Swiss-Prot record:
Domain of life of the native organism: Eukaryota
Subcellular location as annotated: Secreted
Entry keyword annotation includes Secreted: yes
Recorded domain comment: Has the structural arrangement of an alpha-helix connected to antiparallel beta-sheets by disulfide bonds (CS-alpha/beta).
CDD domains: neurotoxins_LC_scorpion
Organism (species): Centruroides ornatus (Scorpion)
InterPro entries named among the record's database cross-references: LCN-type_CS_alpha_beta_dom, Scorpion_toxin-like, Scorpion_toxin-like_sf, Scorpion_toxinL
Keyword Lipid metabolism recorded: no
GO CC terms, sorted: extracellular region
Any Gene Ontology biological process: defense response
Start and end residues of each LCN-type CS-alpha/beta domain: 1-66
The protein, known as: Beta-mammal toxin Co2
Tissue expression from the record: Expressed by the venom gland.
GO-annotated molecular function: sodium channel inhibitor activity; toxin activity
């Protein structure tokens, strides 16, 4: 599974500026989803890869980004 890492409080994606390989996105994806996850900046949001099927990613049901 893949997807944008999401802030549970506001429903927004984790933003990033440096597209492609991005240490911030990689670190945040690993913190949220475990050591096996990958991450990079895609379309100014942190995109996480190699996730488990039940991983919660953006968009959150019934929670819109404010």
């Amino acid at each position: 599974k893949e997807g944008y890492i999401v802030n549970y409080h506001d429903g927004c994606k984790y933003a990033c500026v440096k597209l492609g390989d991005n240490d911030y996105c990689l670190r945040e994806c690993k913190l949220r989803y475990g050591k096996g996850a990958g991450g990079y900046c895609y379309a100014f949001g942190c995109w996480c890869t190699h996730l488990y099927e039940q991983a919660v990613v953006w968009p959150l049901p019934k929670k819109r980004c404010n």
